Amino acid sequence: MENSEDVFNDDYEHPENVEYILESVLMPSDGSSEFNLLAEDYNSILLNQCRCNETTCENIETCTHGGQYEFKPQQKELTLKKLENTARPIIECNDLCGCSKNSCLNRLVQYGPRRNLEIFHSTRYRSHGLRTKVHIPSGAFICEYAGELLTVTEAKKRLENNHTLGLMNYVLVLNEYSNEKKQQVTIVDPSRRGNIGRYLNHSCNPNCYIGAVRIDCPIPKLGIFAARDIEAQEELCFHYGGEDQSKNINEGKACLCAAANCTGFMPNTSIE
Ligand SMILES: C[S@@+](CC[C@H](N)C(=O)[O-])C[C@H]1O[C@@H](n2cnc3c(N)ncnc32)[C@H](O)[C@@H]1O
Ligand SMILES: [Zn+2]
Ligand SMILES: [Zn+2]
Ligand SMILES: [Zn+2]
């Protein structure tokens, strides 16, 4: 299995002057109560360990976390089973779980981005993009979208600033719902500090999508997964509109994705 080493592995670098971070970090404190709540969540540990004992944690019937990933021997790696419901949380096993790290089939994002990714100049998008040097199977984990974790107030300020100054926008807002009710919003900005995930462009017909992945913290990681088989040299893209792709279209900047179903506009990043 490609990701079977139980160590975090990420030796990518930025082509420009941005601080490389391996996973999301808190924004600088602004002293607000909103920041304090975010910091409290960031510093909390999820006490939801599974009680499996040396089993594979594959089976949703027996493992309280399992069931989202599957190991297909022909692909030689864990892949995400269900592609339809991206808002569904994915919970990985962690150090508190009863299972063995070596045999657990519910640990993927925690080992870091896949290898053979490459930052390049995308002529289509006239800026940086991310592509793969080798084939990627459907459902495979690409990388986290890691950056500074923002409060809603700080995110609104940064969005306004990006808009006013005509800067590229890296702020990503992930809403999670349960029974159609919004449960949690996670906002990540890799503009100043981030990982390789910041280079994926938007497409109206993307080959990747974002899922919320929890490991040992109530704040999810934004995991980028392959939405289909992806060929070597293909640029990796996801839909910036997130869970509701019909919203916020026809409002943003002109879209350069060139997909047959392109709406002509990039979705605006909005915070409800
Ligand atoms: C998260 S960054 C993606 C990486 C970026 N291209 C770079 O050079 O660092 C998002 C920015 O890339 C550009 N971009 C991404 N997708 C685009 C699209 N479909 N059409 C036009 N510009 C896009 C926009 O400037 C957007 O604000
Ligand atoms: Zn388990
Ligand atoms: Zn496990
Ligand atoms: Zn488009």
Where are these regions (language model features)?
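Alpha-helical interaction segments
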Residues: 10, 189, 228-230
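Catalytic cores of histone-lysine modification enzymes
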Residues: 73-77, 85-96, 100, 107-214
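C-terminal SET catalytic tail plus cysteine-rich post-SET Zn-binding segment of SAM-dependent SET-domain
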Residues: 2-3, 15, 77, 152-184, ...
